[in-house]
Amino acid sequence: MSYRSFSFLPNIDQNSVFSNRFNQIDKIFSTLTGEKPLSDTPAYNLFQIDEHKYELILSIPGYEEKELDISVHNSQLTVQGKKQNQENDDKKIKKYLHKGIIFNDFSLNFNFDHKIQVKKAELFSGLLKINFECRVPDEEKPKKIFINIPNKVKEIEKNKI
């Protein structure tokens, strides 16, 4: 099972040399050793539509709705995929000449600063689109505290001086 976590920490610019450094290192070693890359998690895009609305799009071709699980717990969004019929398909085939399409189980966790509410999830043409909102609860918003100084306190202080 592959696993990837996401957080709203400041990220490096996409055009930066370091923006995709781990995937690039993984691909270099995979090419040198002939092994498959370690990062088998689905590719995804995360968009901020406005101040509170977000859209997450995952590329998961070959997965059906019943093989996917989307859950929210507090401020964490989890998307999991588990292929069900892969073993039966492999038994029907005598010998692979090349096997480049691999359906691994995956789990993606996205941690946000505040609780989120999923509004809609759609699966179309191998893309899972999840629309959600992330709002700061009123009790967690910063509040301005005003300081009142009554006139009597000012007068007493003037008399003492």
Swiss-Prot record:
<dbReference type="InterPro" id="IPR008978">
    <property type="entry name" value="HSP20-like_chaperone"/>
</dbReference>
<keyword id="KW-0346">Stress response</keyword>
<dbReference type="InterPro" id="IPR037913">
    <property type="entry name" value="ACD_IbpA/B"/>
</dbReference>
<protein>
    <recommendedName>
        <fullName>Small heat shock protein ibp</fullName>
    </recommendedName>
</protein>
<dbReference type="Pfam" id="PF00011">
    <property type="entry name" value="HSP20"/>
</dbReference>
<comment type="similarity">
    <text>Belongs to the small heat shock protein (HSP20) family.</text>
</comment>
<feature type="domain" description="sHSP">
    <location>
        <begin position="35"/>
        <end position="150"/>
    </location>
</feature>
<dbReference type="InterPro" id="IPR002068">
    <property type="entry name" value="A-crystallin/Hsp20_dom"/>
</dbReference>
